[in-house]
Structure formats: C-alpha cells, structure tokens
C-alpha cells in the first residue's frame, strides 16, 4: 500500500472532514490500480479481459468524482488540491 500512503500524503493538508471523504475513495483507487496491473500482466482469458475493463472503468469514475470534489475545494485549499489533481492526472 505504498501508493495509498503516497496519495494520502497529498491530502494531509486538507481539513479532516474532507480527508474522511477522500481516504476511502483513494483506497479503492489504489486497490483498483493493483488489480489492473495484475490483469495487464496476464490478460490471457476472457474473464481477465472483462475484469480488466470493469476495473479500468471504475478507476476512471473514481478519478472523475475526486477531481470534481477537488475543483470545488480549490478555493480554500489550493496547494493540496492542486498537488493531488496533478498526481491523479498522471494515471489517466
């Protein structure tokens, strides 16, 4: 879960109530990324290919939701939100 700890550090400056919303979503994204990597490494079966597609779509939905929330937060916590947006954009 090194990736989760990395993402978690980017939102550390945000208020606790916002972190409480984002942390479960970030955990889900990291889990989806790990599964995506497993399926990328072995996409030999139709099941793996279907799972890969489903998790990729889930990841994109989560990223869109987080970005929307962070754009709304930018007015108050510009630097932390900008940093997380930049990191999330690397994985699109």
Question: Model-predicted segments: where are they?
Answer:
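Extended, surface-exposed interaction regions
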Residues: 1-53, 89-92
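Contiguous, low-complexity intrinsically disordered segments that are highly enriched
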Residues: 45, 49-92
């Amino acid at each position: 879960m090194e990736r989760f700890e990395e993402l978690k550090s980017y939102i550390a400056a945000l208020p606790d109530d916002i972190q409480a919303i984002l942390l479960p979503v970030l955990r889900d994204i990291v889990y989806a990324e790990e599964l995506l990597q497993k399926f990328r490494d072995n996409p030999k079966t139709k099941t793996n290919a279907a799972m890969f597609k489903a998790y990729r779509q889930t990841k994109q939905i989560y990223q869109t939701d987080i970005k929307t929330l962070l754009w709304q937060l930018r007015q108050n916590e510009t630097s932390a939100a900008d940093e997380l947006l930049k990191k999330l954009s690397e994985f699109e």
